[in-house]
């Protein structure tokens, strides 16, 4: 009987560990999935993908840094003792981040145009929106137990 319970315990343990692994992925796995999706949806050739995605992920990293600074500042707003002046600083930081992101988008559009046609860039950006929506749906879907 002990062997049965041990077997059952380890089986459940293995299944739960395996389930946790399938619900999350590393940043590199996520990037690879995103790259594959965008390339397929935008009908990029291997050559186009090889030139485009290093630029694309460079921009994503820069935007992540800009947004990280804004969200770090926003944590102050969780404190009930936050003053109006501090909230104003937080809001200004969000606006500053948006402006910085727009400037980066404009700068990187020129880099994109050096390797892709405008139509392909448009297709990538549309695919990116779809990808992000799909990811939100996955995240918001209640996990079955």
Predicted ranges, named:
Residues 43, 58, 102, 106-145:
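Amphipathic, charged alpha-helical segments and their helix-to-coil junctions
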Residues 34, 38-115:
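Amphipathic alpha-helical segments
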Residues 25, 46, 82, 121-124:
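Soluble, non-transmembrane alpha-helical interaction regions
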Residues 21-39:
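Short N-terminal segments immediately surrounding and downstream of signal-peptide cleavage
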Residues 2, 68-74, 127-133:
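N-terminal hydrophobic signal/anchor transmembrane helix of membrane proteins
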Residues 1-25:
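Bacterial Sec-dependent N-terminal signal peptides
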């Amino acid at each position: 009987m002990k062997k049965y319970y041990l077997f059952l315990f380890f089986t459940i343990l293995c299944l739960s560990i395996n389930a946790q692994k399938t619900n999350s992925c590393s940043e590199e796995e996520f990037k690879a999935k995103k790259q594959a999706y965008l390339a397929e949806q935008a009908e990029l050739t291997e050559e186009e993908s090889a030139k485009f995605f290093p630029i694309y992920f460079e921009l994503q990293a820069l935007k992540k840094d800009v947004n990280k600074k804004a969200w770090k500042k926003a944590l102050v707003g969780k404190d009930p003792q936050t003053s109006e002046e501090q909230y104003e600083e937080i809001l200004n930081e969000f606006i500053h981040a948006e402006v910085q992101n727009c400037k980066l988008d404009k700068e990187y559009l020129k880099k994109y145009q050096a390797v892709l046609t405008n139509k392909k860039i448009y297709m990538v950006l549309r695919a990116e929106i779809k990808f992000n929506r799909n990811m939100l749906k996955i995240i918001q879907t209640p996990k079955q137990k």
